[in-house]
Amino acid sequence: QQHSHYLYIDLKTTSTVSPHLFGHNLEHTRASIMDGLSAQMIRNRKFAGAAARNGVALDWEGIGECVYFANEHRLPGSNANEAYVCHYAHNGMWRRNECQSQMIQNPIPNQVSGIRQKELFLQKDRSYPFAVVVKVQQPLDVRVALTNADGTQIYAETVFPVQPVLAKEDAQEEVDEWQRFETILTPGVDDAHAVISITYTEQAQLLIGAVSMMPDNHFHTMRRDTVEKLKEIGVRLLRWPGGNFAGEYRWQDMFLHPDRRAPMEGYMENETQPFTHGYDMHEIDTDDFIALCREIGAEPFLTINAAWDSPEVCAAWVEYCNGPAESKYGRLRAQRGHQEPYNVKWWSLGNEMGYGHMEGANTPDGYASLVETHARAMLKVTPDLKFVSSGPYPNQEWVDVSIKKLAPIAPYVSLHTYNSVHWDFTSPEGMERCYNEMIRMPIHN
């Protein structure tokens, strides 16, 4: 039996569909960045997190039978040289094991000592720019090699002769003893289980501050294939850097070299623990994000760190994005090669404030008072910004207090709803019920 269905279109009633109807949230969480959008191939390349019992950083293995390994630390607010990575400014936020380096001490002459990392995916038609940052106390040769899984086949290698950096007796300032060495590794093979090793044989100490390796076709440190997929699906509004990660993000760290930017530990470690041990290596900065938006045709939508960044710091971010090249932060943007303002209009006043997983003001009135101060400081830089408030919705108290109080300054609201589905993949009927629940979700949001 056939059934006929008719669709009637009322041409007298029209409405405008926003070009931003289809948007995405690009958050530094789970595998979204590392092994996702980022082209960086080295995992835990800045040695963050608690080391293993043998002193070797997570995702790395030690080389040598009788070698001492340890993680060297930089204490919060310290300028001491214990680690290479650091934050641009101390904003009061403190996280564990962000600023560290890998120490290697070889007590036996001619013993091969160092570290290695497995499971690198190599392509024969690609070259790989490689860099390592080291500090030594005496001359030694640092050998870098790309090999197969058991080390019997060397695909590419190079040796960096390293001399210690010595301070002059009359030096007035502290000397940076860290040195960065670069090369291009061209393995010429396809291997999904390759190994990178960094070794030396002298009876000496080697400190490694950061390691970097990316394919030569990356787009602003991002994977070209992933960028093309984002372009293909037609994202028109892209929110960044979160999400929950907005509460960890320090936008001013972009003024440091990418290798020197300290990793950022997530307050909600459980989200990224299985993927990056709870740390983000800060591979993507504001300039990279804007370049991505322009490449895929999306409007940029930035989220401030309302809990830890002051109104002045958030206003400075607006000036970096939108200020003329003659302004303080616009000048910094121009010096980085971007003379014209980015004209970022959409800004989120924090993320999901009111939920327990976000730090800062978690009451409707407290949140509204906090972000209103931030918003007014930002509007002094760019008066026509479009602010979006956040909160735990549906929640009538937040509607009555927060939304109404912020309405004159933030007319848009971001509703983050979490829906539960009865997962049942044990039978065709269960799968059909699960599917139907999923497709009905928009009706309730």
Residue ranges and their predicted role:
Residues Q1-H282, E299-F301, D309, A315, ...:
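Extracellular and organelle-lumenal recognition/adhesion modules and their flexible linkers in secreted
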Residues L26-T29, W240-G243, T303-A307, L349-M353, ...:
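Active-site-proximal beta-strand/loop segments in catalytic clefts of secreted hydrolases
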Residues P139-D141, N217-T221, Y279-D280, A306-E312, ...:
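Acidic-and-aromatic substrate-binding clefts and catalytic sites of carbohydrate-active enzymes
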Residues A194-Q205, T363-N445:
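Noncatalytic carbohydrate-binding groove/subsite architecture in carbohydrate-active enzymes
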Residues K229-K231, I290-R294, N322, A334-Y342, ...:
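Acidic (Asp/Glu)-rich catalytic clusters
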Residues T199-Y200, P241-N244, S327-T363, H416-V421:
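Active-site groove signature of glycoside hydrolases
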Residues P187, A298, E319-G330, V344:
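Substrate-binding cleft of extracellular glycoside hydrolase catalytic domains
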Residues E27, M214, L292-I296, Y320-P324, ...:
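Structured segments of extracytoplasmic/periplasmic soluble domains
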